[in-house]
A protein has these predicted regions:
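C-terminal recognition in membrane/secretory proteostasis and scaffolding
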Residues: 1-89
């Protein structure tokens, strides 16, 4: 999805693995390459809740949302806090 990140749609297995509440929906970061420029912004277990005002329904959907703009607004949930980032893929 983004350079060095592996994400997956949140499901019950990933909720349990990362301690996510039942109502959390989106894409969870399940892998981060050490050399990824996004490693600090999107740590393991962070959930991409919204991209450009839309909740991603799949990895392909998220990719299309990111590619639709040169700079994208991304809201993530990490350690119980929602944070906002403007990123360039």
């Amino acid at each position: 999805l983004l350079d060095g990140l592996e994400v997956a749609l949140v499901d019950d297995v990933l909720r349990k693995r990362f301690g996510l509440e039942r109502e959390v929906e989106g894409l969870v970061v399940v892998g981060v390459a050490d050399n990824s420029r996004f490693a600090d912004t999107f740590p393991l277990g962070a959930v991409l809740l919204e991209i450009n005002g839309v909740s991603p329904e799949s990895v392909d959907h998220a990719r299309a949302l990111l590619e639709s703009r040169t700079t994208s607004r991304v809201y993530i949930l990490n350690q119980g806090r929602v944070r906002y980032f403007a990123i360039r893929p």
